[in-house]
Structures are given as structure tokens and as C-alpha cells.
Swiss-Prot record:
The lineage of its organism: Eukaryota, Fungi, Dikarya, Ascomycota, Pezizomycotina. This is C2H2 finger domain transcription factor mtfA. GO terms for biological process: regulation of gene expression. One of its GO terms (molecular function) is zinc ion binding. PANTHER family: C2H2-TYPE DOMAIN-CONTAINING PROTEIN (PTHR16515:SF66), PR DOMAIN ZINC FINGER PROTEIN (PTHR16515). It comes from Aspergillus fumigatus (strain CBS 144.89 / FGSC A1163 / CEA10). Residues 7-29, 36-56, 168-181, 216-245 have a biased composition (Polar residues). A zinc finger (C2H2-type) spans 272-294, 300-325. SMART domains: ZnF_C2H2. The gene is mtfA.
Amino acid sequence: MDVASLISPSESDTVPTFRSRSIQNSSASHYKRLSEQSTGSYFSAVPTHTTSYSRTPQPPLSPPAEDQSKCSLPSISILLENADGAAAHAAKRQRNSLSTHRDSDPRPPYDSITPHAMPPTPPLRPGSGFHSNGHSPSTSSVSAASSSALMKNTESYPQAPIGLPSPTDRSSISSQGSVQHAASAPYASPAPSVSSFSSPIEPSTPSTAAYYQRNPAPNTFQNPSPFPQTSTASLPSPGHQQMISPVTPAWQHHHYFPPSSSTSYQQNHDRYICRTCHKAFSRPSSLRIHSHSHTGEKPFRCTHAGCGKAFSVRSNMKRHERGCHTGRPVATAMVQ
């Protein structure tokens, strides 16, 4: 009995197991149903939320206006920046084109200009420059030639003002170097010729002073004057000449002063002034002879018999004796 009961289970034992399984199945189905209901309620609730979200942008009309206002302001600034960028790009492109043009074309115009800058050398030869009226024609020709070379350079390159200083400096330096070499070559050996030119060089010092004022750049070339080094060393400077010139009697001679430059030497040389007409003279004898024209005095008188002519200047009396009286010379009598 006990063994049979152990081998074949009773109904009381089998029923609880079936019930426990049914309970488990029912609980699983219930959980599944709850999960389906919960998911169905979630997915059913989501479309209502999406529809309500899709309806929210429609009622307010102000956000598009704000967006348009926000977009309109940057568009103006962007346009301004684009305009500035376009202008800068155009300027940069023009600068690049000018640089390429300057890199491609500079040789032929400069080669054609350099022969035109060379002709200032012929006026500086002894036959034309130094034996003419002072040295002002040579300096004026040099300045005129350099100015013409500058004008030619500016005319050949009107579009590139930035690149002009270097070729003009080169042309001016080359022309001045050739002028200095041509001027120093014929006057290097004869030293006495410097002393022969010492007296007529004095009137030309205003032109050299003006030449220094026109070219105030000592760094480009060391000796801007076309004179040789020996003659410039013997000549005093214009500022120092005012102190030396009254002492040197050779330069005070009135024959070496042209009429155009007599006014510039009035303070230094013309120290003797007439009290009647305020005319200045460089020597007291000249002032005394001039004073005879105001007083009417004629101290020099011809001593030939039967003549008796009086003269205010002794040279006039000598001329009268040579022209009218061809006899023996007679001692001059001066009336006190």
C-alpha cells in the first residue's frame, strides 16, 4: 500500500501541481495583458501629443517676424563686408597686375632712358663749361638734364608710382657719377689751373649754393658739385666766405662782380655808401670819384698849353691826352 502510493501518485498530489501551473499561466497572461494595455495606452497617448505639438507652431505669427528681423540685419552687414572684401580684392588684384607688369617690362624703358641721362657730361669740358660765364651753365645743364630724366621716367610709368624712386635714384646717381668722373679727369694733373680759376670762381658761388639747396641729399652721392676735388678744397664754403672775402683783395676787384650778383654781395663788399644817393661801393677811391659827380668837382686838369680842360676822373684825362695831344707827356697837375 505504501509502495503503491509512492509509485503512483494520488489525485491530491496531481491537482495542486496542475493548479499551480494554471495559476502561473493565468498570472503570465494577466501580466501580458497588462503590458499590452500599458503599451497600447502609451502608443495611443503619443499621437495625441504629436498632434498637439504639430498644432503649437501655427497660432503665434510673431516668431517668423522676429526671424525675418534677425536675418535682415546680418544681411546688411554681410553686404557691407562683401563690398569691402570685393574692393580689397580688386585693389590686391590691381597691385598684383602692376607688380607683374613692372617685373615684365622695366628693362626696355630703362635702357632707353639711360642714354638720355648721359648727355650732361659734354658741357663740363674745359672748352664749354669752365671758360664760359662762371660754372652756372654747367650746373644748370646738369639740373635740367636730371629734371628731364625724371619727367621721362614719370611719363613712361604713370601707373606705378611706388616703383619710381628706385630707377630715378639709379639714373640720377649714375648721371652724377659720370659727371663727376668726366669733371675730375681733365683737371686731375694740372694743379696751376686751379689757381688760374680762383678769381672767376667767386661769382659762381651763388649758383653752387643754389645747387646745394636744390639737392639736399648728401647720402646719395658724396660730391654733388661738378668741380674737381682740388678746386672744391681750395674754395671756401658759402657760410665761411662771408668772413674771409673782405680780407682777400684779389676777389674784391670790381671787374669780377657781374651786375646780376652785385646785390648779393652788397653787405660784404659794398661797404662804402654815398651819403647823397646811398649808392654802395667796394673801395673808398670809387666812392670819392662818385662824390665828384654830386659836387661837380673836376680835380684833374689837362696841362697842355691852350687846353685847360678839367676832368673828375683821371682815366678820362688820360684818354683826352692820348686822343687830342700826341706830343710829349706832361706831368699831371691835380687841383686841390
